UniProtKB/Swiss-Prot annotation:
It is a peripheral membrane protein. Its main location: mitochondrion. This is Cytochrome c oxidase subunit 6B2. It comes from Mus musculus. Component of the cytochrome c oxidase, the last enzyme in the mitochondrial electron transport chain which drives oxidative phosphorylation. The respiratory chain contains 3 multisubunit complexes succinate dehydrogenase (complex II, CII), ubiquinol-cytochrome c oxidoreductase (cytochrome b-c1 complex, complex III, CIII) and cytochrome c oxidase (complex IV, CIV), that cooperate to transfer electrons derived from NADH and succinate to molecular oxygen, creating an electrochemical gradient over the inner membrane that drives transmembrane transport and the ATP synthase. Pathway: Energy metabolism; oxidative phosphorylation. One of its GO terms (biological process) is oxidative phosphorylation. One of its GO terms (cellular component) is mitochondrion. Belongs to the cytochrome c oxidase subunit 6B family.
Length: 88
């Protein structure tokens, strides 16, 4: 039987995002998109207030865990070009 130390993930490894009651269904596409928006809104708000963006790291970890890399890259390119359809 494995000990408690052997069951812990190594440092720096991602864990599964916790359950979000806003998205109870198996399809997590909307959850991915919403956490991407929440992260960018959080960073924008914290920068505007001159505070640390550390509280925004939760949203970053969740959307990086749920979203395909190609989606995130496309959304970031759209943000840079000013063509992103979401409200940030």
């Amino acid at each position: 039987m494995l000990g408690v130390q052997a069951q812990k993930p190594p440092p720096g490894q991602w864990t599964t995002p916790p359950f979000d009651p806003r998205f109870p269904n198996q399809n997590q596409t909307r959850n991915c998109y919403q956490n991407f928006l929440d992260y960018h809104r959080c960073v924008k708000t914290m920068n505007r207030r001159g505070k640390s963006t550390q509280p925004c790291e939760y949203y970053f970890r969740v959307f990086h865990s749920l979203c395909p890399i190609s989606w995130v890259q496309r959304w970031n390119e759209q943000i840079k070009q000013g063509t992103f359809p979401g409200k940030i």
